[in-house]
Amino acid sequence: MNQVVIYTDGACKGNPGPGGWGAVLRSGTLEKELFGGELGTTNNRMELMAVIQALGALKRPCQVALYLDSQYVRQGITEWIHGWKKKGWRTAAGQPVKNVELWQRLDELAHQAGHRIEWHWVRGHAGDPGNERADMLANKGVEQVLGR
């Protein structure tokens, strides 16, 4: 099983507002950078999109070390999602899960695509080179949708 290290990040100028996502994928000596954005979005949606796009870029099941600065995504996929699914995609308070279509896509990629994923939280803007690069790519995604 190929080993891949992934760093992801999302950015939003205003929340909601124009946003971007970025991902850095490394396997051995190979490195791939991905980014994109949307005009009307939120930071949490962009954090989710970064992980979805990164995992979606993998061509076969991999052993993944995934680094992200979003506790929302890390806790959502490792802790909260099981309860949401049991409750028909509702929160503990009975409210519909926000960004449900993205959570469902991430669930499919994370749990049904055959990947073995270790989820690692890193503090954002704390000098981690992979996180800083993903942040730069996310901001590039914002600039792209703004036509700059």
Swiss-Prot record:
Binds 1 Mg(2+) ion per subunit. May bind a second metal ion at a regulatory site, or after substrate binding. One of its GO terms (molecular function) is RNA-DNA hybrid ribonuclease activity. It is found in: Cytoplasm. Keywords: Cytoplasm, Endonuclease, Hydrolase, Magnesium, Metal-binding, Nuclease. It comes from the Bacteria. Its cofactor is Mg(2+). It is an enzyme of class 3 (hydrolase). Residues 1-143 form the RNase H type-1 domain. Mg(2+) 1 binds at residues 9, 47, 69. Its main location: cytoplasm. InterPro entries: RNase_H, RNaseH-like_sf, RNaseH_domain, RNaseH_sf, RNaseHI. Mg(2+) 2 binds at residues 9, 135. SUPFAM superfamilies: Ribonuclease H-like. Its EC number is 3.1.26.4. Endonuclease that specifically degrades the RNA of RNA-DNA hybrids. Belongs to the RNase H family. Monomer. This is Ribonuclease H. It comes from Acidovorax sp. (strain JS42). The gene is rnhA.
